[in-house]
Amino acid sequence: ILFDTRDADIGGAGSPAARRLQALAAPLDVPPLEPLPKDHVLTRSFYLLTDFPGRYANSPLWVEAAPPDAELAEGMPFRNLNDGVTPVVIGGNDWAAAWAIDENGMAMFPVGRGLAGERQREVSYRFGVNLIMHVLTGNYKSDQVHVPALLERLGQ
């Protein structure tokens, strides 16, 4: 599930949007969260990304925290729960507004300024693609580090 508070995290945990999110999520079994690690598969499920902007660009992205006893594979935490798919993503960059288009295919909301804003919108689309690829395919990208060993085992 993706929670987008659309507030750019300006107010932090005490903002009305954050309090509303806490109230909505209270009955859910939300796992412990952490800011998205730089090595998380969501950063490379299709596009290689370091930022995850929407209409806003500075809100942190939160995902399920790796278990403290997570195995290390190639120096990176190996998330073996849910095939490596985080069950929850939380941010406040207003991705839906960045992705929204009208019946003529024109952007409905401004993003950034000038060409920098259009680049921000493009990266926002890329984040959306990465998110969907991550949801649909799990951790297949992290499995790629094991391909040489698998081919060796198969005698290839």
Indicate residue ranges for each PLM-predicted region.
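A glycine-rich, often tryptophan-bearing local segment used as a flexible ligand/cofactor-contacting loop or short
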Residues: 1-68
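Short, solvent-exposed loop/turn and secondary-structure capping segments
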Residues: 13-16, 100-102, 146
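A structural signal for well-ordered alpha-helical segments within the folded catalytic domains
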Residues: 15, 19, 83, 122-129
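Extracellular/periplasmic catalytic domains that process cell-envelope and extracellular macromolecules
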Residues: 26-27, 79-84, 125
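Short, surface-exposed beta-strand/loop micro-motifs that present aromatic residues
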Residues: 63, 69-81, 85-88, 102
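Short beta-strand-plus-loop segments that form exposed binding edges in beta-rich domains
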Residues: 92-94
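Short, solvent-exposed loop/turn elements at domain surfaces
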Residues: 96-100, 141
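Extracellular ligand-binding/catalytic regions of CAZymes and related secreted enzymes
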Residues: 104-156
